[in-house]
Amino acid sequence: MPIIDLNQLPAPDVVEELDFESILAERKATLISLYPEDQQEAVARTLTLESEPLVKLLEENAYRELIWRQRVNEAARAVMLACAAGNDLDVIGANYNTTRLTITPADDSTIPPTPAVMESDTDYRLRIQQAFEGLSVAGSVGAYQYHGRSADGRVADISVTSPSPACVTISVLSRENNGVASEDLLAVVRNALNGEDVRPVADRVTVQSAAIVEYQINATLYLYPGPESEPIRAAAVKKLEAYITAQHRLGRDIRLSAIYAALHVEGVQRVELAAPLADIVLNSTQASFCTEYRVVTGGSDE
């Protein structure tokens, strides 16, 4: 069953668009309506004065209402899988019997103590979505993905292929180093997927590490004339880093068009790429890893 992309869902109706000026105008209109008709025009003129003490009271009251409505919005988002974060997401995960994984345990022997590195909200949210797949006993792709991802916090991604009937190949991408899964991690995943309540009797499961395809990015930015170039370069690097991180998953291609799009931030006139020179197309058992990226400015064309 395909996973719904929560980022593509429309904003929920329960979350209200807030506007201070609209709330203040409603407050003023309500106050004016409380006066007799022959006094309403004079009160309305008074409320147009910013220095009027009554206006200050209404502004303070409107601001408090704005804060309260925002708190209601936050409370509504906190119970939605698409919006919840942190402890709120942990509570939602408990409803699906899916807990957040520990990537690196806490170390109390250091000074100061090193806190544990936990699974990110994005990865945890995906596993929660797949929780019902984990109930399947028919060996579905989703079930193998769920149990594989839940086996260990070091698992960054899982792919499931069937090269022949009753043969299942599980490729594991690790969060450690460049993504190659260690034998220790493969053993943990193998044990998790061979449980009697997970693997159908007829399935023969092979667990292997993802094949890592390394690449580099070397780009030159040509800018429109302006006083400073470094903020523009920094913005381009930030978007490029986000793209590199997002594509470090199984089966995600590295496309030149996407690199150009990431680097074309406000202020960039054109981009020249020295590397890569072609798209890097991957299958579901492969993952990319950027060993180095270099973004420099080449001045202005004008």
UniProtKB/Swiss-Prot annotation:
Keywords: Late protein, Viral baseplate protein, Viral tail protein, Virion
Induction (free text): Expressed in the late phase of the viral replicative cycle.
Domain of life: Viruses
Record localization: Virion
GO cellular component entries: virus tail, baseplate
Pfam families noted in UniProt: Baseplate_J
Family in the record: Belongs to the P2likevirus gpJ protein family.
Classification via PANTHER family: FELS-2 PROPHAGE PROTEIN
Task of the protein: Baseplate protein that may be part of the wedges of the baseplate.
Protein name, as recorded: Baseplate protein J
Species for this entry: Escherichia phage P2 (Bacteriophage P2)
Originating gene: J
